Amino acid sequence: MSIMDDLMEGRIKLYEIERHVPVDEAVRIRREFIERTCGVKLEHVSNYSIDMERASRRNIENPIGVVQIPLGVAGPLRVRGEHADGEYYVPLATSEGALVASVNRGCSVITRAGGATVRVTGDSMTRAPVIRTGSVVEALQLREWIYENMDALREEAESTTRHGKLVKIDPIIVAGSYVYPRFVYTTGDSMGMNMVTIATERALELLTRETGAHVIALSGNLCTDKKPAAVNLIEGRGKSITAEITVPGEMVESVLKTTPEAVVEVNTAKNLIGSAAAGSMGFNAHYANIIGAIFLATGQDEAHIVEGSLGVTIAEERKGDLYFAVNLPDVPLATVGGGTGLETASECLDIMGVRGGGRVHAFAEIVGGAVLAGELSLMGALAAGHLARAHSELGRG
């Protein structure tokens, strides 16, 4: 009997194939099983160049192949950061026609205007468990215990990692008899979710041993991971980034085909008032477009795109020129670990010169500049009334 026969008869499970054959053969068998079972032909999914054996150990379970997304590049983008200072080409993986062209136009404006000033204003990764006590009185006592034993909790947490540092535990929210302490770490060049989860678990072992409180879940959603949340908008998570540019008025008119005053009005009416009316926490036009395209290109955790959608765009007319800024409080990023080791992701990080250790802040500054470029271009198109035409010509439906 063949492995395929065993699969079809239910004698082995899809996840068990690698116990019998090498990874590449297991991928082929699993894919053929899906083709037979679902009545499809997966000729494109089966074509790839990445090391699937390595990926199956680190990035994927039950692999059957690879999905391909068109990859474009925007630039050069002049970035004036503390860690990234130069002209960069930004890889963007997307299936949305007109997106790369729009970001590219923004890069052109920014570079011609002297470059984007970009700063990383915050750097943290968080994990917030939920802990049960017997009453609100006990909950408040536990909160006080955490404050008083911060050094001991830090020692326990940091004993699990060479790179993670517990900066603070704040806020500590009490809701009835439940306590939600938000553990805040720095994590070096990795995104750090696994790191802070393991570190927090170790700290909680001390807490439960000393207080008798019961940890309901290692994540109580005050983190807040992979969801839009006001706590992240206010406190920050991942890399907090601000990028700004002052575009001369004549350049706004000649390149963006509009005026500084028109861009300011669109930003106020759309990004500020419109977002408030909708109850949105994204006071911007489309941060997620650029964040998503960069994340997919560079092997970031795609579920964090929703966090990168948070933030506020600022536009002001200053003596006939346009001051334009983007503020992204919550962009989890990595240049090591996770999906960054996949061959295509590594190449895309190499395009920007940010692969490997010691480069995550440079990466963050380039990301901020790219979001600024995309936001500036779209706001210019909206102010000029060109959005529908651009999508008609480049999006093609």
Curated annotation (Swiss-Prot):
The keyword Oxidoreductase applies. Pathway: Metabolic intermediate biosynthesis; (R)-mevalonate biosynthesis; (R)-mevalonate from acetyl-CoA: step 3/3. InterPro entries: HMG_CoA_Rdtase (IPR002202), HMG_CoA_Rdtase_cat_sf (IPR023074), HMG_CoA_Rdtase_CS (IPR023076), HMG_CoA_Rdtase_eu_arc (IPR004554), HMG_CoA_Rdtase_NAD(P)-bd_sf (IPR009023), HMG_CoA_Rdtase_sub-bd_dom_sf (IPR009029). Keywords: Isoprene biosynthesis, NADP, Oxidoreductase. It catalyses: (R)-mevalonate + 2 NADP(+) + CoA = (3S)-3-hydroxy-3-methylglutaryl-CoA + 2 NADPH + 2 H(+). It is an enzyme of class 1 (oxidoreductase). Converts HMG-CoA to mevalonate. Belongs to the HMG-CoA reductase family. This is 3-hydroxy-3-methylglutaryl-coenzyme A reductase. It comes from Methanothermobacter thermautotrophicus (strain ATCC 29096 / DSM 1053 / JCM 10044 / NBRC 100330 / Delta H) (Methanobacterium thermoautotrophicum). The gene is hmgA.
